[in-house]
């Protein structure tokens, strides 16, 4: 949908009075066109786009040579959607901050907490740990690590290899709502994983408790890729070929998303398989965990390989195809469907 050009027919002195009073005519504002947008034809800034991991990785490693982690706080390159032209535009799609972070051997990032909800998806390296509220969490490639709002966290690389992961935060949302805060703190003693979290390792089972007891709000902070891949492969081997292999990361106590306001899920594409997810009002970001293939997003075709990141704007048709005839491909999907659902905005289109 093309936004109509607003033309002023108002007297100059009246326009001046409106500006002085910090008022604006609705019929002259961009919001007027937005309110007339038709379903399936939204006015949106985000564009279909793909970040090639080989480029991101090369530039991130270069940053490791140029920037000390003590100087940078976090050595992160932000993935910015080309549709966001303002200096403060930091979204990979319409609402999700995605950044690639590098931690070199021996580095320790400063301990802090903030209002934004954050996750880390490990791309390279196995020698780092994330410490959340004093609890030590191992990080292996493909693992999803949660750092919920208001939780203290830091990262430590204890090995001899660099570690890279994707940071994913709701910072664009909290920033827009003026709900951002950040607080630093000295390091504190670190403990191993809380014993009660071990009880959540078996699917469909949670610790027995009195009906009056309150469960952990975030019972799992680390979702191991080894477990996710095993579950995807089990579904692929038993499901009908017509059924897509798609599993959601869920809070075992509630069945809801592991960390709202976003939904996290993993897809397995069978050899040569092609899938066309339902067209919805949600925007999404895909990360290629492994494999190679192509995705058609809003009429554009992106050929992808391991590590690449793809932005799918709201109400945009998408189709994925596994380019291998012998090996499965795996995709991580992060979308804002839970947020839209909470606000009553979410829609599905035939």
Where does each model-flagged region fall?
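A short beta-strand-loop-beta hairpin characteristic of the jelly-roll/cupin
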Residues: 104, 108-141, 147-151, 278-306, ...
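A short hydrophobic beta-strand segment most commonly corresponding to one strand
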Residues: 119-121, 146, 160-179, 325-347
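A short, N-terminal "cap"/entry segment at the start of jelly-roll beta-barrel domains
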Residues: 2-94, 183-184, 190-261, 265, ...
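Asparagine-centered strand-capping/turn motif at beta-strand->loop junctions
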Residues: 156-157, 321-324
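Intrinsic, low-complexity N-terminal interaction/targeting segments
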Residues: 76, 87-90, 97, 109, ...
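Contiguous mid-protein beta-loop-alpha structural module that forms a pocket-lining wall or clamp
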Residues: 145-201
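C-terminal structured domain segments across diverse proteins
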Residues: 253-255, 262, 278-281, 291, ...
């Amino acid at each position: 949908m093309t936004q109509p050009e607003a033309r002023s027919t108002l007297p100059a002195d009246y326009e001046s009075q409106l500006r002085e009073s910090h008022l604006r005519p609705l019929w002259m504002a961009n919001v007027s066109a937005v309110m007339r947008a038709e379903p399936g034809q939204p006015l949106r800034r985000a564009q279909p786009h793909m970040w090639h991991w080989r480029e991101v990785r090369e530039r991130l490693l270069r940053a490791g040579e140029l920037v000390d982690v003590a100087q940078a706080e976090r050595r992160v390159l932000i993935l910015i959607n080309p549709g966001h032209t303002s200096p403060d535009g930091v979204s990979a799609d319409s609402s999700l901050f995605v950044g690639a972070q590098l931690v070199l051997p021996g580095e320790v990032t400063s301990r802090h907490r903030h209002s934004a909800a954050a996750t880390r998806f490990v791309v390279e390296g196995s020698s780092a740990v994330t410490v959340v509220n004093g609890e030590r969490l191992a990080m292996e490639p493909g693992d999803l690590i949660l750092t919920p709002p208001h939780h203290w966290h830091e990262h430590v690389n204890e090995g001899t290899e660099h570690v890279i992961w994707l940071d994913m935060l709701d910072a664009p949302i909290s920033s827009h709502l003026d709900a951002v805060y950040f607080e630093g703190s000295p390091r504190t003693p670190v403990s191993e994983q809380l014993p009660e979290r071990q009880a959540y390792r078996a699917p469909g089972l949670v610790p027995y408790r009195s009906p009056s007891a309150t469960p952990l709000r975030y019972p799992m902070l680390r979702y191991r890729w080894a477990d996710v891949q095993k579950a995807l492969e089990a579904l692929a081997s038993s499901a009908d070929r017509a059924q897509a292999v798609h599993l959601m990361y869920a809070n075992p106590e509630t069945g809801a998303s592991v960390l709202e306001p976003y939904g996290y899920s993993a897809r397995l594409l069978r050899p040569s398989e092609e899938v066309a997810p339902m067209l919805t009002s949600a925007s999404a970001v895909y990360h290629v965990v492994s494999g190679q293939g192509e995705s058609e997003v809003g009429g554009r075709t992106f050929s992808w390989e391991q590590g690449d990141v793809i932005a799918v704007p709201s109400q945009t048709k998408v189709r994925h195809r596994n380019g291998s005839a012998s090996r499965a491909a795996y995709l991580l999907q992060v979308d804002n469907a839970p947020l839209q659902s909470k606000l009553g905005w979410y829609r599905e289109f035939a």
